[in-house]
Protein backbone atom coordinates (compact mmCIF):
# COMPACT_ATOMS: atom_id res chain seq x y z
CA UNK A 1 0.00 0.00 0.00
CA UNK A 2 2.15 2.83 -1.24
CA UNK A 3 0.44 6.12 -1.78
CA UNK A 4 2.35 8.99 -3.23
CA UNK A 5 0.94 12.36 -2.50
CA UNK A 6 1.47 15.34 -4.68
CA UNK A 7 4.72 17.13 -4.05
CA UNK A 8 4.46 20.56 -2.47
CA UNK A 9 7.75 21.73 -3.95
CA UNK A 10 7.35 24.45 -6.51
CA UNK A 11 10.35 26.26 -7.92
CA UNK A 12 10.20 30.01 -7.59
CA UNK A 13 10.39 32.08 -10.74
CA UNK A 14 13.77 33.67 -11.24
CA UNK A 15 13.93 37.39 -10.91
CA UNK A 16 16.38 39.32 -12.96
CA UNK A 17 17.51 42.56 -11.41
CA UNK A 18 19.25 44.92 -13.76
CA UNK A 19 22.57 46.26 -12.51
CA UNK A 20 22.62 49.98 -11.70
CA UNK A 21 23.51 52.20 -14.59
CA UNK A 22 27.00 53.54 -14.72
CA UNK A 23 26.86 57.31 -14.49
CA UNK A 24 30.49 57.72 -15.36
CA UNK A 25 33.90 56.43 -14.46
CA UNK A 26 34.59 56.40 -10.74
CA UNK A 27 37.31 58.78 -9.74
CA UNK A 28 39.35 58.58 -6.55
CA UNK A 29 38.04 62.03 -5.55
CA UNK A 30 34.56 60.56 -5.10
CA UNK A 31 35.63 58.30 -2.26
CA UNK A 32 38.63 60.16 -0.89
CA UNK A 33 37.13 60.47 2.64
CA UNK A 34 37.30 56.67 3.01
CA UNK A 35 40.94 56.51 1.95
CA UNK A 36 42.28 59.48 3.92
CA UNK A 37 40.77 60.83 7.15
CA UNK A 38 39.63 64.41 6.89
CA UNK A 39 42.06 66.88 8.40
CA UNK A 40 40.45 69.29 10.86
CA UNK A 41 40.55 72.93 9.96
CA UNK A 42 42.53 75.36 12.08
CA UNK A 43 39.43 76.68 13.88
CA UNK A 44 38.14 73.22 14.86
CA UNK A 45 39.57 71.33 17.84
CA UNK A 46 41.01 67.93 16.99
CA UNK A 47 38.85 65.88 19.38
CA UNK A 48 38.85 62.78 17.19
CA UNK A 49 42.62 62.61 16.92
CA UNK A 50 43.28 61.63 20.53
CA UNK A 51 45.70 58.90 21.38
CA UNK A 52 43.67 55.64 21.47
CA UNK A 53 45.81 54.31 24.33
CA UNK A 54 44.96 57.33 26.51
CA UNK A 55 41.25 56.91 25.78
CA UNK A 56 41.49 53.21 26.62
CA UNK A 57 43.10 53.94 30.00
CA UNK A 58 40.30 56.31 30.95
CA UNK A 59 37.69 53.69 30.17
CA UNK A 60 39.52 51.04 32.18
CA UNK A 61 39.75 53.23 35.27
CA UNK A 62 36.04 53.97 35.30
CA UNK A 63 35.09 50.35 34.80
CA UNK A 64 37.34 48.99 37.55
CA UNK A 65 36.37 51.63 40.12
CA UNK A 66 32.66 50.81 39.97
CA UNK A 67 33.01 47.06 40.18
CA UNK A 68 32.88 45.11 43.39
CA UNK A 69 32.87 41.37 44.02
CA UNK A 70 31.03 39.44 41.35
CA UNK A 71 27.78 37.98 42.74
CA UNK A 72 27.09 36.11 39.49
CA UNK A 73 29.64 33.40 40.25
CA UNK A 74 27.93 32.51 43.54
CA UNK A 75 24.45 32.48 42.03
CA UNK A 76 25.54 30.20 39.18
CA UNK A 77 26.94 27.63 41.56
CA UNK A 78 23.78 27.63 43.68
CA UNK A 79 21.51 27.38 40.64
CA UNK A 80 22.77 23.88 39.74
CA UNK A 81 22.66 21.54 42.73
CA UNK A 82 24.88 18.51 42.40
CA UNK A 83 23.03 15.23 42.27
CA UNK A 84 26.05 13.06 42.94
CA UNK A 85 26.17 11.88 39.34
CA UNK A 86 27.86 14.80 37.67
CA UNK A 87 29.83 14.12 34.53
CA UNK A 88 32.25 16.99 34.11
CA UNK A 89 34.90 17.91 31.62
CA UNK A 90 38.56 17.33 32.28
CA UNK A 91 40.76 19.83 34.13
CA UNK A 92 41.45 21.77 30.94
CA UNK A 93 37.77 22.10 30.07
CA UNK A 94 38.09 19.58 27.26
CA UNK A 95 36.06 16.43 27.02
CA UNK A 96 37.74 13.32 28.31
CA UNK A 97 38.14 10.35 26.03
CA UNK A 98 36.01 7.30 26.81
CA UNK A 99 37.90 4.65 28.76
CA UNK A 100 39.55 1.79 26.95
CA UNK A 101 37.15 -1.20 27.03
CA UNK A 102 40.03 -3.55 27.83
CA UNK A 103 40.92 -1.60 30.97
CA UNK A 104 37.35 -1.22 32.25
CA UNK A 105 36.48 -3.64 35.02
CA UNK A 106 32.98 -5.01 34.96
CA UNK A 107 31.15 -4.59 38.29
CA UNK A 108 30.30 -7.71 40.16
CA UNK A 109 26.67 -8.66 40.65
CA UNK A 110 26.53 -7.29 44.20
CA UNK A 111 28.14 -3.95 43.31
CA UNK A 112 26.44 -1.33 41.19
CA UNK A 113 28.01 1.74 39.67
CA UNK A 114 26.09 4.92 39.03
CA UNK A 115 25.99 5.74 35.36
CA UNK A 116 25.40 9.19 33.95
Swiss-Prot record:
Matching entries from SMART domains are given as:
GAGE
Q: Where is the stretch described as Disordered? A: 1-116
Q: Which domain of life is it from?
A: Eukaryota
Q: Where is the composition biased (Basic and acidic residues)?
A: 102-116
| Cross-referenced Pfam families | GAGE (PF05831)
Tissues where the protein occurs: Not expressed in normal tissues, except in testis, but expressed by a large proportion of tumors of various histological origins.
Biased composition, class Acidic residues, residue ranges: 31-44, 86-95
Similarity section: Belongs to the GAGE family.
Misc. comment: This gene belongs to a family of genes organized in clustered repeats. They have a high degree of predicted sequence identity, but differ by scattered single nucleotide substitution. Their sequences contain either the antigenic peptide YYWPRPRRY or YRPRPRRY which is recognized by cytotoxic T-cells.
* Protein's recorded name: G antigen 2D
The protein's organism comes out as Homo sapiens
